[in-house]
């Protein structure tokens, strides 16, 4: 077992497998703590097949009654902005609510307790501030003025370049595991520690690990062209928004790419290497039905772009950060569950402290429970931007 008391570790070599947001930030933090680090990915950082391969991701402090993730979100956002301030687009996030006992109300209480900015807006105020929005069916909304969107693919690529500039080694290679042996492109890995951070490829890579319960459902993201001559759906004019109970979310047009939205419920289970990444007519029409009700000026706009990616869902939507149960000095990091991207820097910082045995540093970021452990989990969709609804609420 690798246990090192010193805070700088030039003698330690760590191999991180997977250059998505968790793996790249873990590699960067290991390097910043002095380790020699090799970051391996079969397609390379920022590739379009990764769960972090789309253009943007929501960053928000609201996580219902949970107060650990809000702290991680703020801690991570500071690091994203330090890496490159243009990675954060401060749109604010608007949470639509139709009841007083839901995710939004729990989030408001938590944000108040943590001293994080939030506003309660009634339906009339929503329509006054953003006339593009029809609050039909909503009685109020929670608004996070300090939240917004992160540039996803560009963020991972930028973090990987920073890691390389800091002396890290980035390699393209196919990792495989056979018992206790790890190979990359056929060559055996020799390292003091290995971190498996392969996102939706974890079930393929480590399928024999007990309690590694990660499903890989398809997720479709639709970009609608904004109306000609109308900038009301651009970032700065309308916030990022979430309908938790309705299982929809959206991000305003950034870089003129279109008004992004997604029916946020799991699609079919897919192989991330083999799935055909084409939008389905069904989900596009579901999305149009939602637009017709709540963003009527967008309802008949054409699809400008589409992304088909995948989630890596754990049953309870909490991440997995734990030791490999049988492989010495190996760690499993994954299960982003549709809300992991924003937390990438905090995950990397926390994992690097665990791997290098810096218990004091790890304790400052540790959750108050065993949520990240390899363990049986009870099904819940709680931490994603989708509630319990199995399909979207749409009145076409």
Regions found by a protein language model. Name each.
Residues 28-32, 87-89, 200-326, 394:
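Active-site substrate-recognition segment that forms the wall
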Residues 55-129, 139, 247:
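Dinucleotide-binding Rossmann-like beta1-alpha1 core, especially the glycine-rich loop
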Residues 17, 189-200:
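Short hydrophobic core segments
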Residues 296-396:
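C-terminal catalytic lobe of FAD-dependent flavoproteins
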